[in-house]
């Protein structure tokens, strides 16, 4: 039997551009409704979240534009790479997300997809788009930190 640590935590896909393009605030963990070949492809880390976003449509939360490549050993029953996937959340969380997305300028962005105890989970974050000058300021601060860190290493 497999050890418990084998199922602990494994990141399958990470949306690195989300932190660069958005101010991320509150985060939610949710399950996903996937087909069998999607699960197998996801476990092979064949997921792209670059243009993906989440939305509350009706009484359900959905992950839109996420790309899960077709499973390499799949047959004619293989899944479509880009389709809407239902997110599994508690009712109060869905209601909260619906209130949040009504505010102008806020969106729901998937930040990562990971395995937790053998189940595939998606982390979505409430996001507000950054302007170009915000991105420049963040880059400037990052380079200043890097230079200071390099200078400290040289002196030590």
Curated annotation (Swiss-Prot):
Localisation: Cytoplasm
Molecular function terms, GO-annotated: RNA binding
Cellular component, GO, one term: cytosol
Region annotated Disordered, chain positions: 135-156
Gene Ontology biological process terms from the UniProt entry: trans-translation
Coiled coil (UniProt feature): none
Swiss-Prot/TrEMBL keywords: Cytoplasm, RNA-binding
InterPro entries on file: SmpB, SsrA-bd_prot, SsrA-bd_prot_CS
Primary localization class, coarse: cytoplasm
Functional summary from the UniProt entry: Required for rescue of stalled ribosomes mediated by trans-translation. Binds to transfer-messenger RNA (tmRNA), required for stable association of tmRNA with ribosomes. tmRNA and SmpB together mimic tRNA shape, replacing the anticodon stem-loop with SmpB. tmRNA is encoded by the ssrA gene; the 2 termini fold to resemble tRNA(Ala) and it encodes a 'tag peptide', a short internal open reading frame. During trans-translation Ala-aminoacylated tmRNA acts like a tRNA, entering the A-site of stalled ribosomes, displacing the stalled mRNA.
Family the entry assigns: Belongs to the SmpB family.
PANTHER family per UniProt: SSRA-BINDING PROTEIN, TMRNA-BINDING COMPONENT OF TRANS-TRANSLATION TAGGING COMPLEX
Listed name of the protein: SsrA-binding protein
Originating organism: Solibacter usitatus (strain Ellin6076)
């Amino acid at each position: 039997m497999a050890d418990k640590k084998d199922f602990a935590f494994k990141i399958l896909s990470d949306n690195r551009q989300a932190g660069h393009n958005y101010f991320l605030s509150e985060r939610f963990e949710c399950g996903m409704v996937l087909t069998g070949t999607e699960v197998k492809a996801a476990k092979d880390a064949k997921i792209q979240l670059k243009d993906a976003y989440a939305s509350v449509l009706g009484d359900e939360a959905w992950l839109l534009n996420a790309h899960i490549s077709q499973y390499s050993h799949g047959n004619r029953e293989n899944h479509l790479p880009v389709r809407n996937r239902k997110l599994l959340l508690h009712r109060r969380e869905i209601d909260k997300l619906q209130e949040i997305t009504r505010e102008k300028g806020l969106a729901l962005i998937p930040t990562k997809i990971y395995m937790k105890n053998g189940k595939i989970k998606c982390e979505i974050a409430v996001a507000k788009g950054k302007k170009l000058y915000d991105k420049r300021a963040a880059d400037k601060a990052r380079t200043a930190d890097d230079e200071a860190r390099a200078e400290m290493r040289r002196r030590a």
